[in-house]
């Protein structure tokens, strides 16, 4: 489980390379493939594959999916300190919350940038960028810059652990804890 949680957030081809290096002592390709199929089939309740969506072409891509744990407790059970990979942990928590609110969730791609989540429910669509802290001006610029190429008028959110309001240019900043405590979904 520790191996899974420490490599979960990388794209699938990289995941396969890491997995292959762990079992490379086995020389029979069929045996490796069978083990991999069995391994992945057993994980379907622990992890969810999230497709990548190209915002400009409005198409779901068939590559570069991301994987998220379905329950944050799985990571905690490995004994990993919460300070290790805090942004990934926060991203996973927001993913679980969006699912619990009934959203279909995809990872956004726009040009060479990534938007952590595109959340869609019926005709409602929202964009989410997750960061641990954005007090630093350069960090804030990097996070907000991702939205520059998104030309539609759907809500764009930046979620962080900061309590100060860093909303700007129509992009709404929220504290992650406040977001998680909202009653009626996104407000």
Where are these regions (language model features)?
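Accessory nucleic acid-recognition modules appended to NTPase machines
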Residues: 1-125
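Flexible, active-site-adjacent loop/turn segments at secondary-structure boundaries
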Residues: 59, 177-178
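Conserved beta3 VAIK motif of the Hanks protein kinase fold
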Residues: 128
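Short conserved micro-motifs at the rims of enzyme active sites and ligand-binding pockets
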Residues: 79-81, 139-140, 169, 185-186
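Catalytic cores of nucleic-acid endonucleases
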Residues: 108, 132-177
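Non-catalytic C-terminal interaction segments of nucleic acid-processing enzymes
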Residues: 179-187
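A broadly conserved detector of short glycine/acidic/proline-rich loop/turn motifs that flank catalytic sites
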Residues: 53, 73-74, 123, 131-132, ...
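Short, surface-exposed amphipathic charged segments that create phosphate/polyanion-binding patches used
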Residues: 64, 171-174, 186-187
């Amino acid at each position: 489980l520790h191996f899974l949680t420490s490599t979960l957030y990388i794209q699938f081809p990289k995941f396969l390379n890491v997995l292959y290096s762990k079992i490379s002592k086995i020389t029979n390709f069929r045996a490796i493939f069978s083990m991999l199929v069995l391994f992945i089939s057993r994980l379907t309740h622990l992890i969810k594959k999230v497709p990548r969506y190209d915002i400009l072409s409005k198409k779901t891509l068939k590559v570069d999916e991301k994987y998220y744990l379905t329950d944050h407790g799985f990571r905690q059970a490995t004994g990993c300190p919460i300070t290790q990979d805090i942004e990934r942990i926060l991203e996973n928590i927001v993913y679980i919350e969006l699912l619990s609110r009934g959203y279909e969730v995809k990872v956004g791609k726009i040009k060479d940038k990534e938007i952590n989540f595109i959340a869609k429910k019926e005709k409602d669509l929202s964009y989410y960028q997750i960061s641990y802290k954005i007090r630093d001006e350069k960090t804030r610029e990097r996070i907000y810059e991702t939205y520059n190429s998104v030309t539609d008028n759907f809500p764009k959110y930046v979620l962080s652990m900061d309590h100060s309001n860093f909303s700007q240019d129509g992009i709404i900043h929220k504290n992650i804890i406040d977001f998680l405590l909202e009653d009626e979904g996104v407000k």
